Amino acid sequence: MGKIIGIDLGTTNSCVAVMDGDKPRVIENAEGDRTTPSIIAYTNDNETLVGQPAKRQAVTNPKNTLFAIKRLIGRRFEDNEVQRDVDIMPFKIIRADNGDAWVDVKGDKLAPPQVSAEVLKKMKKTAEDFLGETVTEAVITVPAYFNDAQRQATKDAGRIAGLDVKRIINEPTAAALAYGLDKGKGNQTIAVYDLGGGTFDLSIIEIDEVGGEKTFEVLATNGDTHLGGEDFDNRVINYLVDEFKKEQGVDLRNDPLAMQRLKEAGEKAKIELSSAQQTDVNLPYITADATGPKHLNIKLTRAKLEALVEDLVARSMEPVKVALKDAGLSVSEIDDVILVGGQTRMPLVQQKVAEFFGKEPRKDVNPDEAVAVGAAVQGGVLSGNVTDVLLLDVTPLSLGIETMGGVMTTLIEKNTTIPTKKSQVFSTAEDNQSAVTIHVLQGERKQASANKSLGQFNLEGINPAPRGMPQIEVTFDIDADGIIHVSAKDKGTGKEQQITIKASSGLSDEEIQQMVRDAEANADADRKFEELVQARNQADALVHATRKQLTEAGDKLSADDKAPIEKAVSELEDAVKGDDKDAIEAKSQALIQVSEKLMQAAQQQAQANTQGQQSQGGNDDGVVDAEFEEVKDNK
C-alpha cells in the first residue's frame, strides 16, 4: 500500500507531511520552503503558477492572481462573507449558474475546488519528489466549523487534483494529534486555538492513554469560518489607504496595481510588528496624477496595529466561551492551550488567550506545520502504520428534519462524536397518504424555517392507511469526514429512499453563528413557538377525530345536535390559522364541551375501534407526526 500523505490546505499557506518511519515529517517544496503560499496565477502565456512564483508576479498581474480561495469554497455567491470579499479582492468573484461563488479569470469561469486543486497538485508533486513514488491518497484538513458543503467541496478539490481523499479531518484535531503524539503518559484536556489565514476554530480535546493506546476525543468545537489573518491584513491596508488619501488626496482603491503592492506591504508590516514596536511602510511611485508621481511613506506602530484589530481578536474569544460551555468545562480544567495558525504569532493574540485561560499557551508546537503533521499521523493510522492512536471527532451542528407544524425535530445534536448513525420513526399527517417529503435541516433553532435547508427528497408508494399508522423510519448517518447521508424507509412496504447532501446548498459560517446566537437569544420565543405548534397539532387532531365521529354517527344525531358541533369545529379551524395559543386552547375546550352528545351516540359503535387504536398506540411509542406533502399519482 502506498503512503497516505497529510495536507493542510490553508487559506494563506499550505503544507504537506508524511510518516517517515514512525515519525511525521514536513516536506520541503521545490523552492526549498516547508510551507507553500496558497496563491495561483494564470499568466498571459497560459501558464499556471502556484505558490511562491505566483506570489512574486502578483503585483504585475493582480486580476489573474487568485488568493484566499478557501474563503469561497462551498459558499453561495449571496453569502454576506462572499459579498464583502467581492468588494476588496482584486480578482473577479462571480455568481455561478448553481448560485455558488466562482471566480472569473480572463473570461473563464473557475470553481473554487478547481482552483484549490492546483495547490493540492503542488502538494502531491512535492510529496512524490521526496518519496520517489506516485502518491494517490491523502488526508486533507478543514476548519472544524466547515459545514457539509465546504467539506464536500474540499473533497472535490482533492479528486480534481488526482487524489483519493481517504479522510477529511478537522484542523484543531490534527494539531492535537501532532502535539499529543510524543507527550508523556497520562490524561489531559487541551484547548486548540486555531487562527489561520481565513478561518478560526477552537476545539476542546481530551487525550487519554489506555494500555499504550492514545485516544484523542473532541469534547466540543466552535468557530468562525470567515475570520483570519486576511481580515487583519485588510485592516492594515484600509488604514494605509485612508492615511494616503488624507495626505495626497488620492484614493488607491481604484488602482488594482497599487492595492496589490499595498497588500504585500501590509502583510509584511503586520508580521514585522510581531517582533518590532514600529515599522515603516515605504512604497515609492505607488501612483501618479497630473502633478507627478506619488510616494507612500507611513509609520505604523504595534500599538496602532493592535487598535486596528482589537475587535477581531475579541471576536475570536466568543467561540472559545461557547465551546467551553458545550464541553461542560471551566477554564481551570484546561491543562494546556495550543496555538495554531500563523496569525497566533501576533503578541496581542497570545496575550488575550493567556488572559482568558489564565496560563501561557504552549510554545513547542509549530503553528504553521502542526496541522499537516497531524494529518500525516492520521494517514499513518488509516494505512495501518500507526496503531496506537484513536481519533474521535464531532459534528459542529445539530441535524434533523421538519415535522408537523413547521418544527425542526433534531436527530443528531451538535458536538456528537462521528461517525454516527441515528434513526427515529415518524408517521403520516393525512389519511391514505401515499408519499412523504423528507426535509433535511441543519441548525439550532426549533422553528424549521429559521434553520438552513440542506435538501429534501420523496418516499413514495406508501400503502393507504389512516394517518399516524404508517411507520416511516428516518436515518441520519454522518461519516468520518463529517458528510451527511439521510435515508427514509417505509417499514410496512420495505421501500427506501436516500440522499447524500450535495454541496450546492452551502451553509455559510455567519449563518451558523447566527443560528447559535439566535437560539440563545430567542430561547423564550422558541419555547412559545413550540407551545403554539403543540396547541395547533392537538386542535388539528381534535377536529379530525370530531369530523370522523360526525360521519360515523350519521343519522343518530339530529341536525339541531350537529349544528353547534359543526360551528365549534369551524371556529377552532379559524383559530388554528392564527397565532394565539390561548384562543386555540379555548376553542378546543369549547368543541370538547359541545361534543358530549356526539361522544355518547358514537361511544358504543367506536368502542372496538378505540380499543384497537389504543393497543396500536402502545406500539407506536416515540412516533412523531410529521408534516409531509402528498405526492399525487396523477400529476
Swiss-Prot record:
Tree of life domain: Bacteria
Q: Which InterPro entries match?
A: ATPase_NBD, Chaperone_DnaK, Heat_shock_70_CS, HSP70_C_sf, HSP70_peptide-bd_sf, Hsp_70_fam
Residues that the record marks as modified (Phosphothreonine) are 199
* Region feature Disordered, mapped onto this chain: 598-635
The reply to whether Chaperone figures as a keyword in the UniProt entry is yes
One Pfam family of this protein, by short name? HSP70
Which PROSITE patterns does the UniProt record give?
Answer: HSP70_1, HSP70_2, HSP70_3
Explain what induces or represses this protein's expression: By stress conditions e.g. heat shock.
Q: Where is the composition biased (Low complexity)?
A: 600-618
* Record's keyword terms, sorted: ATP-binding, Chaperone, Nucleotide-binding, Phosphoprotein, Stress response
Q: Does the keyword Acetylation apply?
A: no
User: What's a Gene Ontology MF term here?
Assistant: unfolded protein binding
What CDD domains does UniProt report for this protein, alphabetically?
ASKHA_NBD_HSP70_DnaK-like
Q: Which NCBIfam families match?
A: PRK00290.1, PRK05183.1, prok_dnaK
Q: What does this protein do?
A: Acts as a chaperone.
Similarity annotation:
Belongs to the heat shock protein 70 family.
- Under which name does UniProt file this protein? Chaperone protein DnaK
